[in-house]
Amino acid sequence: MNRRIARIGILFILFALVVSGCGESGATSGPEDGKLKISASLYPLAFFAEEIGGEHVTVTHLVPPGVDAHDFEPTPKDVVKMADSDVLLYNGIGLEGWVDQVKSSLEGNTLIVNASKGVPLIKTDPHEEHGHDEHEQDHAHEHGNQDPHVWLDPVHAKQQAANIKNALVKKDPKHRGDYERNYDQLAQRLDHLHQQFKETVNKAEGKSFVVSHAACGYLADRYGLNQISVSGLSPSEEPSPKKLREVVKTARKHRVKYILFETLVSSKVAKTVQKEVGARPLTIHPLEGLTQQEKSRGENYFTLMEKNADHLGKALETK
């Protein structure tokens, strides 16, 4: 952790130097070349910006394909991209530990947008035995006891999209009409996705599911489900032996048939739970980023969330 703090400190110094160099030229004063330059920390934010901005924006997703956003640290090239952006979109809730270090240097040059503004946050409680509150506080992550995975709830994703739309309108008011229309179309698709999840949950036999790490708190909260997580808010957290026994006991109690594993993270501990419970593996996509293969296949937020809905429906089946 100390090494990571030191690296972020060095990044902050580099950021200040880059921004001071760009500030005099006015490189980030607006869409002078006809398009807004947008940098986004997470894939969902980049996708929403592309859908809303359309032909008026150029969007850069900072996290490389196949990299877990929890572990991402900006490179010097990323620093230059952010300093040259008209808008920087970040999720907030502590997921991007580097943002606070660079915000002060960017202010005045770049419009900095917390895409989760207005979303009611879920706080975790290690003393709860069930639901999205089940995780160990001993292994605190940068986002503390608040779940940052708001984009997995289509309703909260709609709020994030609205925040992005408002930012684009503020930075580029002459294209307000296009941004509003594109947002309305995106909002309708998110409403449809919300209905799809509701129908999936209503048809399900059970209300509990086991997942390798606690990324589905907002999804569980939205649809009245019980998330049983093997590890905490960060996939790198290792549960204590006591927590592991509790997870196995709870999974058996709810007669789960499947355990949901994230696509970018392989958890040996979760696989141990799977064997103990006698469950089968299923994937759930956290959507923090896409792999190169997924990009090549034309996958996007909606195609992957629809697959998540299908797999969640299976995971809610009971023995």
Segments predicted by a language model, with ranges:
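Bacterial N-terminal signal peptides
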Residues: G9-S20
